[in-house]
Amino acid sequence: MNGDHMVLGSSMTDEKAIILVIILLLLCLVAIAGNCFITAALGMEWVLQRMLLPCDKLLVSLGASRFCPQWVVMGKTTYVFLYPTAFPYNPVLRFLAFQWDLLNAATLWFSTWLSVFYCVKIATFTHPVFLWLKHKLSEWVPWMLFSSVGLSSFTTILFFIGNHRVYQSYLRNHLQPWNVTGNSIWSYCEKFYLFPLKMITWTMPTAVFFICMILLITSLGRHMKKALLTNSGFRDPSVQAHIKAMLALLSFAMLFISYFLSLVFSAAGIFPPLDFKFWVWESVIYLCAAVHPIILLFSNRRLRAVLKRCRSSRCGTP
């Protein structure tokens, strides 16, 4: 899911590429519909009632940050497909890349803070620090949102600086994107600036996320042992809460893993830009992105209630 690598040009008018582009766009539409529902349902409640649960504030922010990038991807995919030999650092693509980097970074941080919230609120560790966090965490949600926007903006500016330097090098030396010297400039910037920057900015939220996931799995294991001893099993409310949270975190895990694999593959040059394998990989990633909001929708009680009301009103039942 690398915005920078969706801009280099080569002809891709063969039938397989066209089919994969169509599939990618359809998956984007599914992701747009799911994230739009989450954002609209919780956003309307926030506006009308002037209040929202802390967890739902994180969820609606995540839905909005996932909703917007899908339009960026659709716009960039359409542009690259129509203009496969377009200059990779022209103003249109640089503007789209800036939006992509900002929204992508925001998604990572919103997902991370939501996983922290699930872990602290649902896990039942008795350590004093953990109990203190459980009591204080809801008050910190606004700071989580502001820090996500601030960190995302900061890293996006750093990405923009790197891309701008490459653009200036192309202009200064009158190079073309397919020129050997031009490719070496881009490769140098990717290897020694963009790749390390991506590793740093993506490793921090991902490490926090997986720590929370491990803690939640540990807590679930303890509860399962107690539930089996009391013969309540999966009917135990605490076990059910753990399982629902785990389903949501698994959907996050798919996104985090796809981000890192995309980063490694692009850095290693395994999938050349606009190669057939590149579009296959993009389709797999956006399949994960399409499934993600669906899992979130069915793991959230409030969203399930809204969906049920929508289905009832559509069927004409009270």
UniProtKB/Swiss-Prot annotation:
Side of membrane Cytoplasmic, spans: 29-40, 110-128, 205-234, 286-318
SUPFAM superfamilies in the record: Family A G protein-coupled receptor-like
Cell compartments where the protein resides: Membrane
Cited InterPro entries: TAS2R
TM segment ranges: 8-28, 41-61, 89-109, 129-149, 184-204, 235-255, 265-285
Gene Ontology MF term list: bitter taste receptor activity; G protein-coupled receptor activity
Signal sequence coordinates: none
Keyword Calcium: no
Role: Receptor that may play a role in the perception of bitterness and is gustducin-linked. May play a role in sensing the chemical composition of the gastrointestinal content. The activity of this receptor may stimulate alpha gustducin, mediate PLC-beta-2 activation and lead to the gating of TRPM5.
Other facts noted in the record for this chain: Most taste cells may be activated by a limited number of bitter compounds; individual taste cells can discriminate among bitter stimuli.
Entry protein name: Taste receptor type 2 member 60
Gene source species: Pongo pygmaeus (Bornean orangutan)
Lineage: Eukaryota, Metazoa, Chordata, Craniata, Vertebrata
